[in-house]
Amino acid sequence: MYFARRVMDVVIGMGASIVSDYPDQFDCPGHLAPLADYHLLSAAVESAKELGTPVRVGNILSEDAFYTDRPNSKDCFRKMGVLAVEMESGALYLNAARAGKRALCILTVSDQQFIRINSN
């Protein structure tokens, strides 16, 4: 994941942009916005405040291919304020919506894909 500032940052996905054909199975005309359940989201933010744990809340990118051959493929999402990239949240939110259930994706940043590390 990246776009958040540091490894170990906690990101709560309010919504999930999707680069995948996964949503097509639901046969919705247009593009459904996969969103977290508001009550779960607000409870998680309140719990983080009580624990003194800083969190960032916002849009995340759910993509089939975490690593690609296109080095600039995520630039648009970064410019649009996407906080992190992962592979499951979009499907989680869509499946929950279809099943009439509630869902929330809480992420911990595990790496920063675009930071170069000097090998010397």
Model-based region annotation:
Residues 1-120:
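Glycine-rich phosphate- or other oxyanion-binding loops that anchor nucleotides, phosphorylated ligands
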